[in-house]
Amino acid sequence: MTKKKVVIGMSGGVDSSVAAYLLKEQGYDVIGVTMQIWQEDKEYEEREGGCCSLSAVDDARRVAQKLDIPFYVLNFRDSFKRNVIDYFVDEYIQGRTPNPCIACNKYLKFDELLQKAKGIGADYVATGHYAKIEERDGRFQLIRSKDDRKDQTYALYNLTQEQLEHTLMPCGEFTKDKIREIAKEIGLDVHNKKDSEEICFIPDNNHGRYICEAAPNKVRPGNFVDKYGNVLGKHKGIVYYTIGQRKGLGLALGRPVFVTDINPVTNTVVVGPEEDIFKTDLVCKDINFISIDKLEGPMEVEAKIRYSARPAKATISPMENGRVKVSFEDKQRAITKGQSVVFYKDDLVVGGGIIESLL
């Protein structure tokens, strides 16, 4: 019987390394690949834990040698710049706060990498994500990881049925501590490697500076205003701010104020008291459903408005033009345009979309 072939994306970290080991132990014919995404026109600064960096390639190659699996580096530079970096920069210029990891998953890891895998006759792609995939009731379902603290389903809500059918995520059945334990047991040097947490293409995590360098003619100073339009001070460019931000505003008003809105048309940043950043209703676009084919009517769910948020009770309702209205039971802090909102029903990912506006 021919072994099923799987191409696994290896970042050089402990999760994808152990995922490769687990798949080999399960009898798959495993091929390791690292996506080459760093941009040669920029000075590339190394950072410990950086995903897909130059040192990450070396770590991934050493793991592949240890596991005795083939290993390749694939050039994804152009696609990464077009689908992730340019998108990231454009969204901030439009006054929104994007999630580049979700774009990377959607366009690179589970689209282009899957196409390349199919091109060499592979049956699956695999990653080290903490999530589970199961077929239930005739649909492939995305299910929360065993390790709730490390669950990564929020960043995977865009996966289609075809992508889920051809994707393996073995780490979803384990806790992070157990994954590190397995890595140590089998002698992988990356067993204690630090997790990558920041944006991989911005080494110092200063996104404002990065965007200014990438699009210097698009960022200009403007006014801080209150909700009535009264000028309160000067800002250095809307790309430096996000909803709910308090620190780094440089305003001395004798009272704490928070960013409540960003207007790219007038190039203004609206600030106000903390109660102004609590809202209950939003509209989202670019919807992808997983557990259901489409939303026929109102559905009670739990929803997350950002990666680090706790799921909160909400009702989702279909709107015209493919939009979905999300109404939370309790007010949510700093709902931010450009971020994703993801819907859950128990352990299943119902779907999600991009936050377009607040009501």
Curated annotation (Swiss-Prot):
Catalytic reaction annotation: S-sulfanyl-L-cysteinyl-[protein] + uridine(34) in tRNA + AH2 + ATP = 2-thiouridine(34) in tRNA + L-cysteinyl-[protein] + A + AMP + diphosphate + H(+)
Molecular function per GO: ATP binding; tRNA binding; tRNA-uridine 2-sulfurtransferase activity
Keyword line: ATP-binding, Cytoplasm, Disulfide bond, Nucleotide-binding, RNA-binding, Transferase, tRNA processing, tRNA-binding
Major location (coarse): cytoplasm
GO cellular component: cytoplasm
Keyword Transferase in record: yes
InterPro entries in alphabetical order: MnmA-like, MnmA-like_C, MnmA-like_central, MnmA-like_central_sf, Rossmann-like_a/b/a_fold
Ligand binding (ATP): 9-16, 35, 128
Disulfide-bond pairs as recorded: 104-200
Enzyme class: transferase
CDD domains: MnmA_TRMU-like (cd01998)
Subcellular localization: Cytoplasm
EC number(s) recorded for this UniProt protein: 2.8.1.13
GO biological process: tRNA wobble position uridine thiolation
Positions of the UniProt region annotated as Interaction with tRNA: 150-152, 306-307
Catalytic residues (positions): 104, 200
Site (Interaction with tRNA): 129, 339
Function: Catalyzes the 2-thiolation of uridine at the wobble position (U34) of tRNA, leading to the formation of s(2)U34.
Family statement: Belongs to the MnmA/TRMU family.
HAMAP family hit by this protein: tRNA_thiouridyl_MnmA (MF_00144)
UniProt name for this protein: tRNA-specific 2-thiouridylase MnmA
